[in-house]
Amino acid sequence: MDEAGSPAPAGTGGGDDPGGSTRETSRRLSREQIFVLVSAASMNLGCMMTYSILGPFFPKEAEKKGASNTMIGMIFGCYALFELLASLVFGKYLVHIGAKFMFIAGMFVSGGVTILFGVLDQLPEGPIFIAMCFLVRIVDAIGFGAAITASSSILAKAFPNNVATVMGSLEVFSGLGLVAGPPLGGLLYQSFGYEVPFIFLGCIVLLMIPLNLYILPSYAQESDPGKQSFWKLVTLPKMGLLAFVIISLSSCFGFLDPTLSLFVMEKFSLSTGYVGLVFLGLSLSYAISSPLFGLLSDKMPTLRKWLLVFGNLITAGCYMLLGPVPLLHIKSQLWLLVLVLVVNGISAGMSIIPTFPEMLSCAYANGFEDSISTLGLVSGLFGAMWSVGAFMGPILGGFLCEKIGFEWAAAMQGLWTLLSGVSMALFYLWEDSTARRRSKAQNSLGTEEERAALLPNDT
């Protein structure tokens, strides 16, 4: 697409061009756009279900096999580390591989290894079990990294003026996957044992592949990104701060995977099935609130940055209350824990949804062209930074819970989002101040030029 037809600085990334966004939303969705939505929704739902089923029962099962809390955290965390590497590679080479092929292949790998994870309980306890858990999770992460990178790029290409709205709406399906995964996994585990949850959900993902092969459109490959350097993108100051925001939010989610279920079981003596319902508070509120924040981000782009900032600050407060931190002298109660998780889900949607369009706007404002290659780079960066946090969260969470307990560990986790929220607030205030000074200087220069032009006429 040439520069005249490019929605890059304006429409892309959240509706900086209200006119373009209105024209886009006023038209009915094309058949191709509907198919893209169906494909992305099926991937979000299936992969999030397979990702989230581990929470309620795997930590306890791994303990039986001789894994420590730190090792369990590393099993959760290695997924994110290799999703990070996969996102960087696949984002860079999206143009060469092809978005549709990458999407389908990623789903196939993820579904297949999920089934394999279901037979790991047949292995002897100790190093063999732990090593195979790492191996299967690593391959699953590579598959998911491919699928999510391709999905983000396809969505941004199909909906250039409504990225936040579409991604926020699709987070409903991510949320549904996160909502359905833990209770469904816990129920199947209690009823049928370790194998059935993985085999059942792995088969669901594999059954979605023929549908996506048929309906997902193929976008014409463009030229090599060439000068569109990933490192140029990453070294932009605003992009670096946005990356820090993503890492801090992702690490908060990752922190809960190996720690929350054990804390709830020990503190409130809940069964595995009820632990899955506790996870429901976070996932359901995130799924419900995400479309609203996506719509707000596109319709009111100036509000986007403050949604991001306040979402981070609220998330920090939630993690202080999750234990709660002993300094507050508040008794830990189940209703309070669930309430905090619900608020955390809303604040997470407030922070996460505006981030991707902010990244796109930053890239386009700094000379990156509107193309599938740029979308691949931004999608890869988003996925990579999310994976950094998702890698650090479980490992640090498992380690800190062993050393200082869940209450203090959660409070320390909240400091991440507090720091990222304050950093972004300071940057946006500086950015606004700089823009105002530049505007005043331009107005002053224009006035001087007008006066100079009028002087000869007065004489």
Curated annotation (Swiss-Prot):
PROSITE patterns referenced in this protein's UniProt entry, alphabetically: MFS
GO BP annotation list: serotonin uptake; spermidine transport; spermine transport
Region (Disordered): 1-27, 440-459
Residue ranges with Low complexity bias: 1-10
Transmembrane segments: 34-54, 71-91, 101-121, 128-148, 168-188, 196-216, 236-256, 275-295, 307-327, 334-354, 380-400, 410-430
Phenotype of the disrupted gene, per the record: Mutant mice show impaired learning ability and memory functions associated with decreased accumulation of polyamines in the brain.
Localization, UniProt: Cytoplasmic vesicle, Secretory vesicle membrane; Cytoplasmic vesicle, Secretory vesicle, Synaptic vesicle membrane
Domain of life (superkingdom): Eukaryota
Membrane topology qualifier: Multi-pass membrane protein
CDD domains hit by this protein: MFS_SLC18B1
Catalytic activities: spermine(in) + n H(+)(out) = spermine(out) + n H(+)(in); spermidine(in) + n H(+)(out) = spermidine(out) + n H(+)(in); serotonin(in) + n H(+)(out) = serotonin(out) + n H(+)(in)
GO molecular function: monoamine:proton antiporter activity; polyamine:proton antiporter activity
Residues found modified as Phosphoserine: 21
Cytoplasmic side: 1-33, 92-100, 149-167, 217-235, 296-306, 355-379, 431-459
Function: Proton-coupled polyamine antiporter involved in the translocation of polyamines from cytosol into secretory vesicles prior to their release via exocytosis. Uses the electrochemical proton gradient generated by a V-type proton-pumping ATPase to couple the efflux of protons with the uptake of a polyamine molecule. Facilitates vesicular storage of spermine and spermidine in astrocytes with an impact on glutamatergic neuronal transmission and memory formation.
Protein name: MFS-type transporter SLC18B1
